[in-house]
C-alpha cells in the first residue's frame, strides 16, 4: 500500500532564518540572541512595543544592519555578509515604510523599469506588465505619476513592482502605515494573495490588530528577546502577552482572507494554480522516494494512505494539500468550471491515488491555457 510521509524536516519550500542574532549599541543590547524563521507560503509577524528590538531584527534580515553576533540564512546558505542587492537577486524582496515609487515616473513605467532588468523578452515584459496592472487593479492609474497616487495605490504599485522579479520572499516594513482603513483591507487581501503564490512574507508593523489578523505565526519581542512565538490565536490568548503588549481588551479579528472573500476579490491566476499542482506532484515524488528508502533513513513515522488527510494536523504536506484543495474549489467556482470543481471536491475524500488525481487536475488546468 502506498504510504505518505509527513515531516517538518521534509519540505520543498525555502526558508529564511536567523540564528542567535545579537546587536549592541554602546553598552545596550537591543537584540539578544533572536532566532526566527519564515517559510515560503506563510505570513509571519514580527511584533513588539517601541524599543523591543523588532525593527533592528527586521533590518538585520533585510541587510540594512549588520549583526554583531549571529547569522542570517537562506536555507542553509549563510547570507549575513551579503548586501541587499545580492539578497534581492536570491529572491528576497523588501518594501520599506517610506514611499519607494519613482515619483516622476508613471505607474506602468515604475513596473516596467524593474521588468527591464529581468531576463524576459520585450514581449514577455509587456505581457507581465499588463498582468500585474490587472492583478493589482492599477489600470485606471497606469499613466499617473507616483507622486499623484493615494496611499493604497502607492502600496499596490510597490508590491506589483516587487513581484515583477518573481521573489520568493517579501519583507514588509510597516505596510499599514499612512493609509486609510479601506486601503488597509485592500493591502491585507493582497498580502493574503501573495501567500497563495508561495511567497513567504515577514511583516513588522505597529498596527498589531491589522497585522495579527493575517499572520499564520508571529514572534513577540520584549526587551530584545523573543517573549512569545506561535499562531496569532496563541498570542492573543496568552495572558502575559495581553498584559505586556496587547492589552486586556484586545480582540483578534480574524477574517477568512485566504478563502472565499479575499480570493473572489483578487482572483487566483491560472498559472499560479498550475504551479501549485505541479509543486504538489513534485512533493509527492519526494515522498515516494522517502518511502522507498525506509523509515530508518529518516527516523520518522509513516502514515498509511487510509489515514484521513484531515487527521494529520498541521504537518506541512497535509496542510499544503488541504489548502490546495480549497484553492482548486475556489478556482472552479470563479471560472464556472464544473469539471475542475468536481475533481477538486472529490480530492482527498476517497481512496483515490493522490498522484493520479493531481495529474488529472493538472491536465484539465492546462487545457484552460489553450
PLM region descriptions:
Residues 47-49:
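The feature captures the beta-strand-to-loop junction immediately N-terminal to the Walker
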Residues 62:
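Helix-to-loop junction immediately C-terminal to a conserved catalytic motif
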Residues 166:
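Conserved catalytic motifs of ABC-family nucleotide-binding domains
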Amino acid at each position: 500500500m502506498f504510504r505518505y510521509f509527513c515531516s517538518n524536516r521534509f519540505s520543498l519550500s525555502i526558508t529564511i532564518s536567523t540564528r542567535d542574532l545579537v546587536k549592541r549599541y554602546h553598552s545596550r543590547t537591543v537584540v539578544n540572541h533572536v532566532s526566527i524563521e519564515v517559510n515560503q507560503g506563510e505570513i509571519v509577524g514580527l511584533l513588539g512595543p517601541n524599543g523591543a528590538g523588532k525593527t533592528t531584527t527586521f533590518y538585520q534580515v533585510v541587510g540594512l544592519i549588520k549583526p554583531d553576533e549571529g547569522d542570517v540564512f537562506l536555507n542553509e546558505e549563510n547570507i549575513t555578509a551579503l548586501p541587499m542587492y545580492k539578497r534581492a537577486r536570491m529572491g528576497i524582496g523588501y518594501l520599506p515604510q517610506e514611499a519607494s515609487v519613482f515619483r516622476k515616473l508613471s505607474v506602468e513605467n515604475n513596473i516596467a523599469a524593474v521588468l527591464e532588468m529581468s531576463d524576459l523578452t520585450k514581449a514577455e515584459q509587456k505581457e507581465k506588465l499588463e498582468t500585474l496592472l490587472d492583478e493589482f487593479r492599477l489600470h485606471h492609474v497606469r499613466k499617473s505619476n507616483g507622486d499623484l497616487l493615494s496611499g493604497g495605490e502607492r502600496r499596490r504599485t510597490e508590491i506589483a513592482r516587487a513581484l515583477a522579479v518573481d521573489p520568493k520572499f517579501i519583507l514588509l516594513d510597516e505596510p499599514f502605515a499612512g493609509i486609510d482603513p479601506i486601503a488597509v483591507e485592500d493591502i491585507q487581501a493582497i498580502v493574503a494573495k501573495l501567500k497563495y503564490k508561495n511567497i513567504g512574507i515577514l511583516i513588522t508593523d505597529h498596527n498589531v490588530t491589522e497585522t495579527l489578523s493575517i499572520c499564520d505565526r508571529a514572534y513577540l519581542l520584549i526587551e530584545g528577546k523573543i517573549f512569545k512565538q506561535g499562531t496569532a490565536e496563541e498570542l492573543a490568548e496568552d495572558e502575559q502577552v495581553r498584559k505586556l503588549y496587547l492589552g486586556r481588551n484586545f480582540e483578534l479579528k480574524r477574517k477568512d482572507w485566504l478563502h472565499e472573500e479575499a480570493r473572489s476579490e483578487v482572483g487566483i491566476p491560472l498559472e499560479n494554480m498550475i504551479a501549485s499542482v505541479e509543486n504538489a506532484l513534485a512533493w509527492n515524488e519526494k515522498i515516494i522516494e522517502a518511502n522507498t528508502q525506509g523509515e530508518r533513513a529518516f527516523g520518522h513515522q509513516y502514515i498509511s494512505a487510509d489515514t484521513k488527510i484531515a487527521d494529520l494536523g498541521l504537518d506541512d504536506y497535509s496542510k499544503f494539500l488541504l489548502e490546495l484543495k480549497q484553492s482548486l474549489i475556489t478556482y472552479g467556482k470563479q471560472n464556472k468550471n464544473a469539471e475542475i470543481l468536481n475533481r477538486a471536491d472529490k480530492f482527498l475524500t476517497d481512496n483515490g491515488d493522490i498522484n493520479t488525481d493531481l495529474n488529472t487536475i493538472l491536465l484539465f488546468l492546462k487545457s484552460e491555457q489553450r
